[in-house]
Structures are given as structure tokens and as C-alpha cells.
């Protein structure tokens, strides 16, 4: 229905952003809302209009390729929008594609809500069907053009990041496990999220 929305970021929260376009605020759920910063510069968000009997929502992405993988993940039995967003938020979408092609279930079960059965279903449904998804085109959500020290964070930024992790489906025990490491840093909300996701995925085996 919508290819993309252009406008200005009016609100950034743990689960979604609000984009103002001609006086209308669009609530758009994204993998990591904090990659979108409030500014006077107009941005473009590629969208997916999700409609079911009990829900209608807009999901947004920085690239068409990111959106493409999201839609393919939704086609897998056992994966809903929240699970697909958690996979994309990891910043390892290229590795997800590689894991599917190489039938690496151990990597796939690292994500919240993905057990062995769902991982196997992802492989069965998507292996050999991701040729149009180019990993190099994905935004690496762990990388940043700024040094982590360029903007000092605070407890507010850390709290926002932890809320974002919970919104993605990570259990409280998992979130608590990475807090000591995050407390050693002084980062922005976006950087805290990237750091936490890196710790969570690298720590799961």
C-alpha cells in the first residue's frame, strides 16, 4: 500500500518512531527506532503495511533490502512481526542469510522467539530463495560513523536502550545479563542498543 514515507522524526520510542508528513503523524514500528534521530532534516522510511483481523500497523526500514528480508521472514510459520524485527535489529542480517543457506540452526536459535523448530522452518522455507536479498546493501546496525565517545550518554539513554531490548522480546534475565557491561560505557541510546545486541548474540551458544 505504501512504498515509503518521507517526513520529519517527531518522536522516538522503544518500539516505534513517529514521522510527521504534512501535519499527519505516522506511527512506524522499526527494528531499532533509535537509528532515527529527531532533526530538521527530512528522512525517508521504507514501509510495510501489515494488516490482520485484529491489527493494522506500519513497519519501517532504512533500506528496501531490509524490508524485503522482513517480508520473507513473515512468510515463515512461527515468525510474526515482532520476531522478524528482533532478527533485523541484531545488525547481522547478512549472517542470517548465510545461516539459512548453510543450515546453521545454532546461529538462528540465538534470536528471541526462535527455537529449533522455527529455525528449521526458516531453512526449509527460505533456503535458495534469498538471491534477491543482497547482504552488502543492509545497514550494519552495529557500525557507526561516529566514535562511541563522540556523544556522552546518561542513565536515560541506558534505560531507553533496555526498554527497546524488552520490546524486541528479550527476557528480563537476558537484559540483566548485559547491564554490568553496559554500565562501563557512556553511549547514546542507539549505541547502547547495538552494544547490547552484540553482547547478547555473542554470548548465546
UniProtKB/Swiss-Prot annotation:
GO terms for cellular component: cytoplasm; Holliday junction helicase complex; Holliday junction resolvase complex. It comes from Bacillus mycoides (strain KBAB4). This is Holliday junction branch migration complex subunit RuvA. The keyword DNA damage applies. It is found in: Cytoplasm. Pfam families: HHH_5 (PF14520), RuvA_C (PF07499), RuvA_N (PF01330). Homotetramer. Forms an RuvA(8)-RuvB(12)-Holliday junction (HJ) complex. HJ DNA is sandwiched between 2 RuvA tetramers; dsDNA enters through RuvA and exits via RuvB. An RuvB hexamer assembles on each DNA strand where it exits the tetramer. Each RuvB hexamer is contacted by two RuvA subunits (via domain III) on 2 adjacent RuvB subunits; this complex drives branch migration. In the full resolvosome a probable DNA-RuvA(4)-RuvB(12)-RuvC(2) complex forms which resolves the HJ. Its main location: cytoplasm. The keyword Transcription regulation does not apply. Residues 1-62 are annotated as: Domain I. Keywords: Cytoplasm, DNA damage, DNA recombination, DNA repair, DNA-binding. InterPro entries: DNA_helicase_Holl-junc_RuvA_I, Hlx-hairpin-Hlx_DNA-bd_motif, NA-bd_OB-fold, RuvA, RuvA_2-like, RuvA_C, RuvA_C_sf. One of its GO terms (molecular function) is four-way junction helicase activity. GO terms for biological process: DNA recombination; DNA repair. The RuvA-RuvB-RuvC complex processes Holliday junction (HJ) DNA during genetic recombination and DNA repair, while the RuvA-RuvB complex plays an important role in the rescue of blocked DNA replication forks via replication fork reversal (RFR). RuvA specifically binds to HJ cruciform DNA, conferring on it an open structure. The RuvB hexamer acts as an ATP-dependent pump, pulling dsDNA into and through the RuvAB complex. HJ branch migration allows RuvC to scan DNA until it finds its consensus sequence, where it cleaves and resolves the cruciform DNA. Coiled coil: none annotated. Belongs to the RuvA family. Residues 63-141 are annotated as: Domain II. Residues 142-152 are annotated as: Flexible linker. HAMAP family: DNA_HJ_migration_RuvA. Has three domains with a flexible linker between the domains II and III and assumes an 'L' shape. Domain III is highly mobile and contacts RuvB. Residues 153-205 are annotated as: Domain III. CDD domains: UBA_RuvA_C. It comes from the Bacteria.
Amino acid at each position: 500500500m505504501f512504498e515509503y514515507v518521507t517526513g520529519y522524526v517527531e518522536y522516538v520510542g522503544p518500539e516505534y518512531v513517529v514521522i510527521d508528513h504534512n501535519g499527519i503523524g505516522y506511527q512506524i514500528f522499526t527494528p531499532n527506532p533509535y537509528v532515527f534521530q529527531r532533526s530538521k532534516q527530512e528522512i525517508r522510511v521504507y514501509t510495510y503495511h501489515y494488516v490482520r483481523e485484529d491489527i493494522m500497523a506500519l513497519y519501517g526500514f532504512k533500506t528496501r533490502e531490509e524490508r524485503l528480508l522482513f517480508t520473507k521472514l513473515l512468510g515463515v510459520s512461527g515468525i510474526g512481526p515482532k520476531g522478524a524485527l528482533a532478527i533485523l535489529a541484531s545488525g547481522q542480517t547478512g549472517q542470517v542469510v548465510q545461516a539459512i543457506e548453510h543450515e546453521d540452526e545454532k546461529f538462528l536459535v540465538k534470536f528471541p522467539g526462535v527455537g529449533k523448530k522455527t529455525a528449521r522452518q526458516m531453512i526449509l522455507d527460505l533456503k535458495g530463495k534469498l538471491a534477491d536479498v543482497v547482504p552488502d546493501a543492509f545497514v550494519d546496525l552495529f557500525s557507526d560513523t561516529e566514535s562511541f565517545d563522540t556523544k556522552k550518554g546518561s542513565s536515560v539513554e541506558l534505560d531507553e536502550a533496555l526498554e527497546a531490548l524488552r520490546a524486541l522480546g528479550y527476557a528480563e534475565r537476558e537484559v540483566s545479563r548485559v547491564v554490568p557491561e553496559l554500565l562501563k560505557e557512556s553511549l547514546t541510546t542507539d549505541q547502547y542498543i547495538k552494544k547490547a545486541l552484540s553482547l547478547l548474540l555473542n554470548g548465546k551458544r
